Amino acid sequence: MGQKINPLGFRLGTTQGHHSLWISQPKNYSKGLKEDQNIRDFIQNYIQKNMRISSRDRVEGIARIEIKKTIDLIQIIIFMGFPIENRPRKVKEKIKELQIHLEKEFHYVKKKLKIAITKIAKPYQNPKILAEFLAGQLKDRVSFRKAMKKAIELAEQADTEGIRVQMAGRINGKDIARVEWIRRGRLPLQTIRTKIDYCCYTIRTIYGVLGIKIWIFIDEK
């Protein structure tokens, strides 16, 4: 019987890279991973509460957060799909505030903390941003099929070669959970050298929890 594998882990080291870049002793490895996850959660919550994202779709817009650690420096790069605010001066102030709050939260006294924000060129090529868009549509009571088709249209406009959107759970409040999916274009999941991006996203609705999975194929010629 065939087994499903995570597309990102399957391509790690070929077309996918690590989001945490540091070296640690084996006994401290789990502690470092937990710290990274706490940093990511803290940044996402802070941006959601304190920063205004310039997106008409009310998407948070964080594609990924990379963390690089050395002996005396922690460098955090936030990849975003949409700009924060409209004034560069205001953005610098917000980043400085975030840095101060992070230093207080994680007690970084001996280590220097550096935060940078990088805007990605095509936001809707990123499955996490698409999943956030889809979640926002469902919260606005848009039909799930209409929302899925709109997400696929946005991905196609961003020059993707192929996409699959899958939704599972009590869709439209039905008593029995089911799986619905739509696929467009090519999606060669078994070829390691292909650039496949993937996201698994959870959304809480009035009917219960829905799971969203998105696969995107980007042909990098």
Curated annotation (Swiss-Prot):
Give its localization.
Plastid, Chloroplast
GO biological process, alphabetically ordered: translation
Q: What molecular functions are annotated in GO for this chain?
A: rRNA binding; structural constituent of ribosome
Recorded GO cellular component terms are: chloroplast; cytosolic small ribosomal subunit
InterPro entries with a match to the protein in the record: KH_dom-like_a/b (IPR015946), KH_sf_prok-type (IPR009019), Ribosomal_S3_C_sf (IPR036419), Ribosomal_uS3_bac-typ (IPR005704), Ribosomal_uS3_C (IPR001351), Ribosomal_uS3_CS (IPR018280)
Q: Look up the coiled coil feature and give its residue ranges.
A: none
Could you tell me which residue ranges the KH type-2 domain spans? 43-121
Q: What is its main location?
A: plastid
Q: Which UniProt keywords apply?
A: Chloroplast, Plastid, Ribonucleoprotein, Ribosomal protein, RNA-binding, rRNA-binding
- Gene3D superfamilies, per this entry? 3.30.300.20, Ribosomal protein S3, C-terminal domain
Q: Does the keyword Ribosomal protein apply?
A: yes
Domain of life assignment: Eukaryota
Asked whether the keyword Iron is assigned, the reply is: no
Q: How does it assemble?
A: Part of the 30S ribosomal subunit.
What family does the database annotate?
Belongs to the universal ribosomal protein uS3 family.
Which PANTHER family does the UniProt record give?
30S/40S RIBOSOMAL PROTEIN S3, SMALL RIBOSOMAL SUBUNIT PROTEIN US3C
Write the protein's name: Small ribosomal subunit protein uS3c
Q: Which organism is it from?
A: Jasminum nudiflorum (Winter jasmine)
Supply the source organism's classification: Eukaryota, Viridiplantae, Streptophyta, Embryophyta, Tracheophyta
